[in-house]
Swiss-Prot record:
Domain of life of the source: Bacteria
Main location: cytoplasm
PANTHER family associated with the record: ISOLEUCINE--TRNA LIGASE, MITOCHONDRIAL, SOLEUCYL-TRNA SYNTHETASE
Pfam family, one: tRNA-synt_1
Co-factor binding comment: Binds 1 zinc ion per subunit.
Location in or out of the cell: Cytoplasm
Obligatory cofactor(s): Zn(2+)
BP-aspect Gene Ontology terms: isoleucyl-tRNA aminoacylation
Protein name per Swiss-Prot or TrEMBL: Isoleucine--tRNA ligase
Length: 940
């Protein structure tokens, strides 16, 4: 055999079988950086149609987690696939840099501002801390193979961005959307600040649930309403609440106008009294209150009780009955304790009735000094004391511990309160912001489509947006208000532009350093500077304006796509929609795509306490970024995304199949020069032309899947193509021709030309997902080419040509089915020790007339398709009993061991081995391939 080895075309490549990604990828990243790859991509797309994916900024605090990785990889896949589609698709990553979490970290290091350190120094420390966090996260994102403008990202703390945030607020003001008011807002007593909707998490909490009686002031008038002539016992309207601490702020009792209310007399332990509650709940109520007997004395509509007055249970005033749409009969009594300073619904209904917005609670959650009974007590600790006082006053009808979902601070994980404070709001309804936003939601494509109804519900029900915070590290609300009437300076918009110019030069500290007289002159004495800062959701929500509209690479195009986790419907998607609608009366995006959260293999949330956290840094260090990228792409992101070591190892197995396919392609293109050796698709062997045609079809399906953001479909199509059509059919069949045909022969060059086209196409298919591997393959492909696959477009060399003489695609698919059935019998013969390998076999196909004609058309080349040394086709009627019926209708198969001699060069067993005296160990075909013109192939 050694004499003939040099006559074979053995595969050879520098592309290693093992990826060794964890070690090889960092060196590739260094080359990408040194070659300024991102800039090369930008230069290659000058003048092309833009596609703008705007990066939602992660918070500049802590290491990136697996959810961050999913998000950035999905964005990178889209950017790279859009670039391949010919778009100019810049990617500018960003970071959210202001806000409380950074303040808390800096406080741990240097103390609170105004104590050991000045506010100005504190802000500078916050800036340094955020910058260091950005640096750490940036390195981790780059390690994932994400290409972008990493050297010039956007930061919400960039001076220019801070200035643009101020300018954007000026637009909101000039369009009439800003208002000041005392309203109840989510308030964290640990933060000492208002919270945005998106900063509130709901957790279970046990609270005291109490039923409290408010005694009627004018008993005869109430009895008359119910048509009762006389009643000699106390009468109370009863509320049910889980926040006893809010009772000092009670200013009304709310009921539903259309509900029936009853006057019920009941006796408990020889004490008789009457209560007013909703009719549908009265039996539950008297049972809950331990009644031994009860009687309904009268029944009227809620609307008839409006403005009836009842005495506060422990404060020296009485409160009215008011009508509210928010009153339900899901639980309680059908009467709602109303404290306008401690609840959104209470506030809204209170405004209609001109109720006082009482707020007896300070920033720290402690009752103010002038609060009767509870001054100096923290509200949550005061709950028990409120209950005790109610009991003492005879107003407590029931008291139980109640487990329920309650809002908590996202940062401190502690319960929060609703608290009325003077704040700045973007009004949802004053200038029609809500209706415009709802209309714009309809003009946006939501992926998955359930995102639309989700955000519609949120917008329809959301309160005014409280955009002010009482913090140190944030973009200031750069307003001057009149000291006497709290009205904005009439020139606020132009003054804000002057302040923005200063911030652009010196950062937000310029506002705190500013003496009002520098801008207001003699008017300075009449105005005070606002010291509040903006909600950080305003910072990130305005980036369509402060970043996209401001940076030249976006060409003023506007944003095509926002892509974030499903929690951002109430976060970034919402704040961006509100601000874009407030500024421009249109949505900031054309498409919004959401992905699910990452969970472990059992569907559980990632948790350090459970020990199921998968850190992306560990994955890249162990398996490589391409494995992580393949897992992301192969997972349906529309739901929860399961990840575990086992799942990642499965992704690594899939990766090996793709890598092995790439290696086969490269190894068999050894010595192929496209310019000199290419066979036109029309001139190829039929099987090769069919394979190019199949690749063209797969490419169109893969491109369509990329366009629809169906990346799991991309990986499925890719794996199917590599494993089935290439791996177990085409590549198996062509090995013989590739290795044994004459090196320069048409038969071999045809096959190599097909492999070249497939490799050129496939390297592009995988580039958005397996970026490192695609680059590795690209560097080793033959022919002249640009430095990187990432500057290319989808391959156009896959000509879908069908000649008259060609077998139809369905014909090849039938042959593939026949081969699968033959393989089953060959495998059985191997298990039965009849054969060693398939080339020891001779196969007879007993087929019905139609099938026989389709199989026999290949003639002697049928054996190459079946990977046997001989293959015959006979009528099915001639099949002996030993022939095996297959799952393919009209086909029986008989496998036997050939008695022909084995050719030492091609390993086929042929009758003509030794027929040429000079080559006694070779078959006639191999002699032709060594000394003659080389064999000709028509089909395979």
């Amino acid at each position: 055999m050694s004499d003939y080895k040099s006559t074979l075309n053995l595969p050879e490549t520098e592309f290693p079988m093992r990826g060794n990604l964890a070690n090889r990828e960092p060196a590739m990243l260094e080359r990408w950086n040194k070659d300024k790859l991102y800039q090369q991509i930008r230069d290659s797309r000058i003048g092309r149609k833009p596609f703008i994916l705007h990066d939602g900024p992660p918070y500049a605090n802590g290491s990136i987690h697996i959810g961050h990785s999913v998000n950035k990889i999905l964005k990178d896949i889209i950017i790279k696939s859009k670039t391949l589609a010919g778009f100019d698709a810049p990617y500018v990553p960003g970071w959210d840099c202001h806000g409380l979490p950074i303040e808390l970290k800096v406080e741990q290091k240097v103390g609170k501002p105004g104590q050991k350190i000045s506010a100005a120094e504190f802000r500078e420390e916050c800036r340094k801390y955020a910058a260091a966090q950005v640096d750490g996260q940036r390195e981790d994102f780059i390690r994932l193979g994400v290409l972008g403008d990493w050297h010039k990202p956007y930061l919400t703390m960039d001076f220019a961005t801070e200035a643009n945030i101020v300018r954007s607020l000026a637009k909101v003001i000039s369009n009439g959307h800003l208002q000041k008011g005392v309203k109840p807002v989510h308030w964290c007593t640990d933060c000492g600040s208002a919270l945005a909707e998106a900063e509130v998490e709901y957790e279970d909490k046990t609270s005291p649930a109490i039923d409290v009686g408010f005694n009627v002031v004018d008993k005869p008038a109430l009895l008359a309403k119910f048509g009762v002539a006389q009643y000699n016992h106390d009468i109370a309207m009863v509320i049910w609440t889980t926040t006893p601490w809010t009772l000092p702020a009670n200013r009304a009792l709310a009921i539903a106008a259309d509900l029936e209310y009853v006057l019920v007399s009941f006796t408990k332990e020889d004490v008789t009294r009457a209560i007013v509650v909703a009719d549908v709940l009265h039996e539950d109520c008297v049972k809950r209150f331990g009644a031994e007997s009860f009687e309904v004395l009268g029944r009227i509509k809620g609307s008839e009780l409006e403005l009836t007055r009842f005495a506060h249970p422990f404060l020296d005033f009485d409160v009215p009955v008011i009508l509210g749409d928010h009153v339900t009969t899901d639980a309680g009594t059908g009467v709602v304790h109303t404290a306008p300073g401690h609840g959104q619904d209470d506030f809204v209904v209170g405004q209609k009735y001109g109720l006082e917005v009482a707020n007896p609670v300070g920033d720290n959650g402690v009752y103010k000094a002038d609060t009767p009974f509870f001054a100096g007590q923290h509200v949550f600790k005061a709950n028990d004391n409120v209950v005790a006082l109610l009991k003492e006053k005879g107003a407590l009808l029931n008291h139980v511990a109640y487990r329920h979902s309650y809002p908590h601070c996202w940062r401190h994980k502690t319960p929060i309160i609703f608290r009325a404070t003077p704040q700045w709001f973007i009004s949802m309804d004053n200038q029609g912001l809500r209706s415009t936003a709802l209309s714009e939601i309809q003009n946006t494509q939501w992926i998955p489509d359930w995102g639309q109804s989700r955000i519609e519900t949120m917008v329809a029900n959301r309160p005014d947006w409280c955009i002010s915070r009482q913090r140190t590290w944030g973009v200031p609300i750069t307003l001057f208000v009149n000291k006497e009437n709290e009205e904005l300076h009439p020139n606020s918009v132009s003054l804000m532009e002057r302040v923005a110019n200063r911030i652009e030069q010196h950062g937000i500290q310029a506002w705190w350093d500013l003496d009002a007289a520098e801008l207001l002159g003699d008017e300075a004495e009449q105005y005070r500077k606002v010291t509040d800062t903006l909600d950080v959701w305003y910072d990130s929500g305005s980036t369509f304006e402060t970043v996209v509209a401001a940076r030249p690479e976006f060409q003023g195009h506007g944003v095509d796509l926002y892509l974030e986790g499903s929690d951002q419907h109430r976060g970034w998607f919402m704040s961006s929609l509100m601000l874009s609608t407030a500024m421009h009366a249109k949505a900031p995006y054309k498409q919004v795509l959401t992905h699910g959260f990452t969970v472990d293999g059992k569907g559980r949330k990632m948790s350090k306490s459970i020990g199921n956290v998968i850190a992306p840094q560990e994955v890249t260090n162990k398996l490589g970024a391409d494995i992580l990228r393949l897992w992301v792409a192969a997972t349906d992101y529309s739901g929860e995304m399961s990840v575990s070591d086992e799942i990642l190892n499965r992704a690594a197995d899939s990766y090996r199949r793709i890598r092995n396919t790439g290696r086969f392609l490269l190894a068999n293109l050894n010595g192929f020069e496209p310019e000199a050796d290419m066979v036109a698709v029309a001139d190829m062997v039929a099987l090769d032309r069919w394979m190019v045609r199949r690749a063209a079809k797969v490419q169109s399906e893969i491109i369509a899947a990329y366009e629809q953001y169906n990346f799991h479909l991309v990986t499925h199509k890719l794996m199917q193509f590599c494993s089935v059509e290439l791996g177990s059919f085409y590549l198996d069949i062509i090995k013989d021709r590739q290795y044994t045909a004459k090196r320069e022969s048409h038969a071999r060059r045809s096959c190599q030309s097909a492999l070249f086209h497939i490799a050129e196409a496939m390297v592009r298919w995988i580039a958005p997902v397996l970026s490192f591997t695609a680059d590795e393959i690209w560097q080793l492909l033959p022919g002249k080419r640009e430095a990187y696959v990432f500057t290319q477009e989808w391959y156009e060399g896959l000509e879908s040509i069908t000649l008259e003489s060609d077998l139809a695609d369905s014909h090849w698919e039938l042959l593939l089915s026949v081969r699968n059935e033959v393989n089953k019998e060959l495998e059985q013969a191997r298990r039965d020790k009849v054969l060693g390998g398939s080339l020891e076999a001779t196969v007879t196909l007993y087929a019905d007339t139609e099938l026989a004609a389709k199989v026999a058309v290949l003639g002697d080349e049928l054996r190459f398709v079946l990977l046997t040394s001989d293959a015959k086709v006979l009528p099915i009627d001639a099949a002996p009993e030993s022939a095996v019926a297959t799952e393919l209708a009209g086909l029986k198969v008989l496998v036997a061991k050939t008695e022909a001699a084995k050719c030492e060069r091609c390993w086929h067993h042929r009758e003509d081995v030794g027929s040429v005296e000079a080559h006694p160990s070779l078959c006639g075909r191999c002699v032709t391939n060594i000394e003659g013109e080389g064999e000709a192939r028509a089909f395979a």
